[in-house]
Amino acid sequence: MSQQQPWWNGAVIYQLIVRSYRDGNGDGIGDLQGLASRLPYLRWLGVEAIWLTPIYPSPLDDGGYDITDFKAIHPDLGDLAAFHRFLTAAHSQGLKVVMDLVMNHTSTLHPWFQRARWAPQGSPERDIYVWSDDPHRYADAPVLFRHFESSNWEWDEVAGQYFLHRFLRHQPDLNYANPFVQEAMLDVVDFWIDRGVDGFRLDAVPFLCEEEGSRCEGLPETHAFLKRLRQRVDSHGRDILLLGEAIQPVDEIAPYLLQDELHGAYNFALTAHLFAAIASGSVDNLRNCLEEAQQVVSGCRWALPLRNHDELWLGDGHLIPEEVIQIIRAGLHQGQGHWLNWGINRRLAPLLNGDPGSNRVLHALLYSLPGMPCLYYGDELGMGDWPGLRDRDPNRTPMAWTPARNGGFSTAPDPLLVLPPITSPGYDYRVVNVEVQKQLPGSLLNWHRRMLTCRRLLPALRYGDFELLKCAHPGVISYVRCDGSMTVLVAANLSAAGASLHLDLSRWSGVRTREVFWGCEYPPASEDWFVYLPAHGFSWWLIGEVEDVSSD
């Protein structure tokens, strides 16, 4: 690109849970010291940024998203000095660090809430949270954690009032109508930027403000605060990412991506449509979703996850149509019996029944669509999960590094481990781990590394324009990414049967066409260009004469 791009434009983001990644001091809990020791692996893999789920002090009733201090590190994970050492090491490896910032709520054990519940009604201390005498206020706001909560309100005996909690009852919502709350959260952002972080993943960003008669999502007051947040971030004078988690349809996310608000947002609707395409073998809904996303917000501002630390969120018919939800529930048989809240509580590989073809074709799309691909730790290995653990813990088990005890995660005795390592058939850590897969040229890990290497060497896949191509086959999606003189053609078969394609490449008629990964020559582009894709097969092709990028 002739114009300097911010670091996050098209960057591959690797999400990890510090307490489940690597134990550096032998106490059974992953920590910043252990994570720092694995930074060379992340550099080797080819990711460009690390998203840390919350590392703040917390009673851990919701995996650290219930925070008691926004300006400290949980003692299990280290301290601010350990964070500084980790951040310095990450930057020395060329890796950016994105913090998870939970702006919507705190823990009930946060000092703010403890003062609020004892303070008199109408006092500044009480007003830091949202209180009511009526538990039926904001009745149109859906209960998000419907398997755990029956209401968005919880009675507090000390306060003599109900407090609002859009999440769990131990996570009271902050009151963003209070200027103190806004200034306090902006001060938290300043604190971490001053320590060198490169961005923030903004948790639950639509729910900051409330209004009677609405779903209490994405209200004008919320956008007004996000504009203030963007101004504060920009005032630091360097590229700092603001990435919003808004589980909403793409047309409702668009206002967050105005030039004076967030830099990017997750496209969870696209995630759902990718799984629906695999489940049904049809790409019609996926094509429509991609077209809508690019019409609403063009370019590479969408963050693209397949899985993360939560359930695969499908929603109540608001995020995606009910018929698409039913396609996923009926087609992904390994998700049956694992429904949690509004989604499926399984890791990627088990959800796909361990099928490597489905796994690879979904990631091939993820790495070639416009946006910021998000890779959840362990998915590069095809790690399994532990159904039966509480809440979302089945998806948050320790990273498998070696065939040694505990998968090389920790030397601690089994009872001290933060969670048990995977030992289920087909996913046992003694087989599915980094050390073993590094030695196997055809492993999923080495495949991911090769894909990320090719993506890094092909600017069209990171920055390029996106255009869907017409394709008569109902199970195949095809598109081109173009950046200057470079054009990359992508075709992916989401069906469980082979597909013969005839693509119209007449605009490149007679131009050389080569497959990216192995450099294989294909017939020159033509008006009726033929290619065969096996079941769940895909390919990337370079169109035209460019530098050879097939070797690494």
Can you say where each PLM-predicted feature lies in the sequence?
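Active-site and adjacent substrate-binding regions of carbohydrate-active enzymes
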Residues: 1-552
